[in-house]
């Protein structure tokens, strides 16, 4: 069976679903989204943090992984005895800041649009993000952050111990204070993916779940479509690679070139529903904690270079719980 589309999107996570939804606003395009399982598998395991500043200045699991890998490579190059300074944050380029802040600014309007036009609520919450300070090393880390973002001084504020306790009564009394990022908020990651997907469906996008892309149709350097395991052939003018951890594999099929994308294992802890304990998202040098609108508390995240391994391991889970 051959199907013909203007655009085929390979991948139904939050990126693929977002692309599908935004393209579906154009009524002149015939669009298909293909996903190997139900959409949003990895997206559902994320914290849902819209941490435009936090992720850019060395907080959050992505940058934690970068620091971990940088330390490993430095030790490999210079010897296992080398000391890697953990008090200096890895500040991402200004272009990343700008991209993240502009993206964040779209969410209030997007939240309203998906609720009003498509009946989908992805639980956008203006929670802020607090980096909790326990010792001199934490404070030094926070001071490095502030020193590197003078253009965003209006988006951060220092909280002393009394202000932190007033803002977050459940935080340990050992905490000395916090650095708060005022524009960093959160959403429900699986609801966001579902909202994009349902909005795209209502706008006419054809959805193909539990469908694997097994090959790419090519004529020289030109991509003509994809082959799938159970839905036949899709001809398309444009193929969009939104395959997440499998993006490198799809890139080779389409271009003979691999892109530097690899899976990173992340373990999290999700509690049962609890009374409201947190007023905002918290992060430390060891973990981050976010309470969702339904009362569940998410504690994350390990960042492990273990490929597609999805098993849970007690030492890592215990470490997250202890850190929280």
What are the language-model segments listed below?
Residues 5-32:
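N-terminal Rossmann-like FAD-binding beta1-loop-alpha1 element of flavoenzymes
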Residues 30-35, 158:
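Short beta-strand "acidic-cap" motif of Rossmann-like dinucleotide-binding folds
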Residues 92-93, 120-133, 142-203, 224, ...:
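Helix-loop-beta segment of a Rossmann-like dinucleotide-binding subdomain
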Residues 157-160, 208-209, 241:
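General beta-strand structural signal in soluble alpha/beta enzymes
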Residues 49-163:
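Dinucleotide-binding Rossmann-like beta1-alpha1 core, especially the glycine-rich loop
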Residues 178-238, 246-249:
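Helical element adjacent to the flavin cofactor pocket in flavoenzyme catalytic cores
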Residues 18-25, 42, 48-55, 63-88, ...:
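Active-site substrate-recognition segment that forms the wall
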Residues 38-39:
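Helix N-cap at the beta1-alpha1 junction of Rossmann-like dinucleotide-binding domains, i.e.
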């Amino acid at each position: 069976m051959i199907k013909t589309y203007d655009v085929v999107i390979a991948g139904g996570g939050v990126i693929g679903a977002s692309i599908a939804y935004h393209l579906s606003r154009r009524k002149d395009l015939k669009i298909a989204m293909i996903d190997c399982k139900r959409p949003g598998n990895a997206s559902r395991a994320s914290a849902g943090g819209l941490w435009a500043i936090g992720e850019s200045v060395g907080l959050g699991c992505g940058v934690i992984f970068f620091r971990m890998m940088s330390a490993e490579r430095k030790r490999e190059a210079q010897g296992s005895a080398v000391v890697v300074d953990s008090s200096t944050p890895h500040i991402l380029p200004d272009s990343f800041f700008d991209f993240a802040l502009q993206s964040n600014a779209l969410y209030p309007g997007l939240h309203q649009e998906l609720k009003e036009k498509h009946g989908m609520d992805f639980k956008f919450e203006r929670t802020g993000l607090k980096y909790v300070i326990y010792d001199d090393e934490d404070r030094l880390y926070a001071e490095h952050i502030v020193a590197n973002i003078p253009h965003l001084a209006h988006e951060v504020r220092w909280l002393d111990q009394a202000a932190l306790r007033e803002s977050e009564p459940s935080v340990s009394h050992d905490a000395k204070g916090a650095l708060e990022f005022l524009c960093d908020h959160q959403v429900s990651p699986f609801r966001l993916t579902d909202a994009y997907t349902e909005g795209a469906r209502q706008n006419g996008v054809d959805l193909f779940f539990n469908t694997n892309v097994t090959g790419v149709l090519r004529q020289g350097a030109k991509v003509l479509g994809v082959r799938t395991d159970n839905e036949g052939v899709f001809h398309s003018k444009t193929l969009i690679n939104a395959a997440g951890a499998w993006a490198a594999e799809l890139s080779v099929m389409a271009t003979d070139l691999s892109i530097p994308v690899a899976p990173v294992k992340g373990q999290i802890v999700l509690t049962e529903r609890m009374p409201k304990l947190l007023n905002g998202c918290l992060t430390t040098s060891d973990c981050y904690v976010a309470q969702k609108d339904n009362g569940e508390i998410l504690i994350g995240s390990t960042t492990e270079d273990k490929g597609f391994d999805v098993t849970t391991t007690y030492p890592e889970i215990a470490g997250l719980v202890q850190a929280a």
